[in-house]
Amino acid sequence: MRWAIGCGLFAGALALATPVMAQDARMTVTATPAEPSAIPLNTGGVKGQAAPEAWFSQYGVAMTRNVTTATLTPFLPDPAKATGAAVIVAPGGGFLMLSMENEGWRVAKALADRGIAAFVLKYRLKPTPADMGGFERSVTAMFAGAAQPQRRMSPDEAIAGLGDQIADARAAVAMVRARATEWKIDPARVGMVGFSAGAMTTMATTLAAPDTHLAFIAPIYGSMEAVSVPADAPPLFAVLAANDPLFANKGFGLIESWQKAGKPVEFHLYQAGGHGFGLGKTGTTSTGWFEDFMHWLDANGMLVRR
């Protein structure tokens, strides 16, 4: 598997994991929100992490960092509309923070509105300084490092670096299947959608833990590098903007890998949208990806009530 997940990519994803729009880019500390529906996944903590989980606002959306306890938050559809399909939603944030609102809750609510049980995965993150000033300084330092040539990680290094995230994703899938009857879910129709770093988590789970048997995967503005496709790889739906500053203009190896392996694949390259657009950047065709995704799920038999 040829897949670059380096320090520079972490920094870039961190900078761009929130929507690029004319809003306040300052990081403002906020109170930790109540998460009464969040279910601990019991996957352990984070080695060397002493700082508590912290929440803040940037670009007008809720973010969190220093996550040491992975959780899964259900967004269940109206039983009258439920299709039986389920999706694990993995937000992005460069593995240093999570864009919970833009790439988590909003997406999950949109899925539930369409009859799909959605589950926002708050996965464990890399440690950052406890105080916001220290966090901002560490981000600045990382940006400076990202400007320098980066060593390409080996496949084993890349997967090893995402061990916590893969474990959290596997636990999330296992929990959804274990409670399928309670949540009125077809265990054979559990897929995963991930944004940026969440897309990398989705792909890493698919490649390193094929025993999760995901029914489908949707990496949204994730890496397009070629991979070694598992024999039982699930159907893939991928989205990217042509002006994505991280992943555009680097070829479409991921798509070609799925094609060459003879696996179902659909790819949407939108003219504009940048990176971190969530459900879509207003004024661009990237706002159409969610409907395209719904159509693709339906065409692949994922939304048929059984």
Feature-to-residue mapping (PLM):
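Alpha/beta-hydrolase
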Residues: 90, 220, 270-273
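C-terminal catalytic histidine-bearing segment of alpha/beta-hydrolase fold enzymes
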Residues: 62, 136, 259, 264-306
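Bacterial N-terminal signal peptides that target proteins for export
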Residues: 1-9
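Primarily recognizes the serine-hydrolase "nucleophile elbow" in alpha/beta-hydrolase
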Residues: 163-233
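Acidic catalytic loop of the alpha/beta-hydrolase fold
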Residues: 243-248
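Serine-hydrolase catalytic machinery in alpha/beta-hydrolase-like enzymes
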Residues: 38, 45-71, 78-87, 92-183, ...
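N-terminal signal peptide c-region/cleavage motif recognized by signal peptidases
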Residues: 17-19
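Short beta-strand/loop motif that positions the catalytic acidic residue
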Residues: 238-240
